[in-house]
Design a protein with these regions (language model features):
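N-terminal leader segment of winged-helix/HTH proteins
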Residues: 1-51, 177-185
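Exposed, interaction-prone assembly regions rather than primary DNA-binding/catalytic cores
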Residues: 147-185
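Charged, amphipathic alpha-helical coiled-coil/dimerization segments
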Residues: 2-6, 10-11, 15, 91-154, ...
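Short, polar/charged, Gly/Pro-enriched helix-capping and turn/loop motifs at alpha-helix termini
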Residues: 42, 46, 133, 137-140, ...
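Short, locally clustered residues in the helix-turn-helix/winged-helix DNA-binding domain
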Residues: 36, 62-66, 127
Length: 185
């Protein structure tokens, strides 16, 4: 006795999945996350296997190559990371001697971060490899599709930032307290 065949999924016209999602893998955030997981795994392998740094640490290295002498809080803001994760990555990069920390004159609590010569060498060796992976990924698209994607990503980033700042109806996270916020009764 054979089991009945599963009911066919309602078909969605290609190019319409985002506007009319039928399943989790039709949702924009899910699809972007999967793309990052798959394509990003190559960057992780390059970073960790080739240079002994995490992808997050690579983000800090790239930012400090572009903006040397940046305070950790500004680095966190520009990378969209929380301060604790940034602090852990900074501590790791300091121990690997890829970045240096210099106290500000007049206020030793304030500091700026810069790449060391070793950190700059890692950046200069790794960046062309990451750019090549980026180009390989984009090679699957026509030039006009790449341009449209670039424009769409720019607009979506602006929209997401606007939503985060204006959507006060969405509950805040309280991860340090174990999840959802519960008002004291």
């Amino acid at each position: 006795m054979s089991s009945p065949a599963p009911a066919p999924m309602p078909s969605v016209v290609p190019g319409q999945r985002l506007m009319h999602p039928q399943a989790a893998n039709d949702l924009l955030m899910y699809r972007l996350n999967r793309l990052l997981a798959v394509a990003g795994s190559l960057v992780v392998r390059l970073c960790e296997g080739g240079y002994g740094i995490t992808r997050r640490e690579w983000g800090l290295v790239m930012m400090l190559a572009q903006h040397p002498g940046m305070p950790p809080a500004e680095l966190a803001r520009r990378l969209g990371l929380d301060r604790s994760r940034t602090s852990r990555a900074v501590t790791s990069l300091l121990s690997k001697k890829l970045i240096s920390r210099e106290s500000m004159p007049g206020d030793r609590r304030q500091a700026v971060l810069s790449l060391t010569p070793t950190g700059l060498a890692v950046h200069d060796a790794l960046l062309p490899q990451v750019k090549a992976l980026n180009q390989e990924l984009l090679a699957g698209l026509a030039p006009d599709a790449v341009q449209a994607l670039d424009i769409a990503l720019h607009h979506m980033q602006q929209r997401a930032e606007s939503l985060v700042s204006t959507r006060t109806d969405v509950p805040r996270t309280y991860r340090l307290r174990g999840g959802r916020h519960h008002d004291a009764a």
